[in-house]
Amino acid sequence: MRNPLADKVVDIKPSGIRKFFDIVSEMQDAISLGVGEPDFDTPWHIRDEGIYSLEKGRTFYTSNAGLKDLRQEICNTIQRKQGVTYDWQHEVLVTVGGSEAIDIGLRAMCNPGDEVLIPQPSYVSYEPCAVLAGATPVIIDLKAENEFRLTAEELEAAITDKTKVLILPFPNNPTGAIMEKSDLEAIAKVIEEHDIFVMSDEIYSELTYKEKHVSIVSLPGMKERTIYINGFSKAYAMTGWRLGYCCGPAAIIQQMTKIHQFAIMCAPTTSQYAAVEALKNGDPDIEEMRTA
């Protein structure tokens, strides 16, 4: 019988962290430190909005890109917090968690043989997603003496003529490292010089403590070459709602939406209604959980 399996899938090792999580989830009174998950419940006003949407029978598909109200609130939030303007109609896509955005972003941008730069330690899904997209992951080992920040020199040394995308995972899981504005400015200069693209995973953007998070998309020339990824799991304790989003150049978002519409159709409708409430009225919840 022919082997029914694809080599590139078989060669990927299952996540060790998820294995530990599955084991702990079946144990009583165990505190799991295995995955990045807040130990708070989703705030009640957000849950109530999801419940209300069900009671009103809002259980149908949304548009592929997501609810209009949600995409508009995403744009309002980014403008308010990062000073960056996006077009809700053409530059925003609501996804099933930030993880889907990583997956379809790499698939939309990478051709076979393209290299994806991945600073590590970092989220376990980056490397497998690059492989599944047909790209070649190139690891940049971050150093403790640099507080696990990515330096311009490390980035420069890793770039080749095959480099297509840099994944920028800051604030970082698992190290907790953050990038200061001066760090990002140096990184941005290298990115522009080599004409590469950035996938900026900022899912932990609300969990900084000493200083306000700065996004690379807020720097001159970076919005045009960056896919900005964020979501609701960490900031609003909504991991199980499975909702994220990405913003970027319309041409890239259009191709990501194409993959999304064939593979997913749309993100969960109930979660989208709850997320509108989170963005509109959830800032006090973020602060309460962040400082608890």
Q: What are these model-derived regions, one by one?
A:
Residues 27, 133, 193-194:
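Helix C-cap/helix->beta junction micro-motif
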Residues 223-291:
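Conserved core segment of the aminotransferase class I/II
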Residues 108-130:
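Conserved PLP-anchoring active-site segment centered on the Schiff-base-forming lysine
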Residues 86-92, 112-115, 162, 223-226:
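Short acidic capping loops at alpha-helix termini that bridge into adjacent secondary structure
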Residues 33, 166, 201, 226-229, ...:
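Structural scaffold positions in well-ordered secondary structure
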Residues 138, 142-210:
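Active-site phosphate-binding strand-loop segment of PLP-dependent enzymes
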Residues 5-97, 104, 278-281, 287:
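N-terminal small-domain helix-loop-helix segment of the aminotransferase-like
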Residues 131-138:
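A short helix-loop-beta submotif of the ANL/AMP-binding
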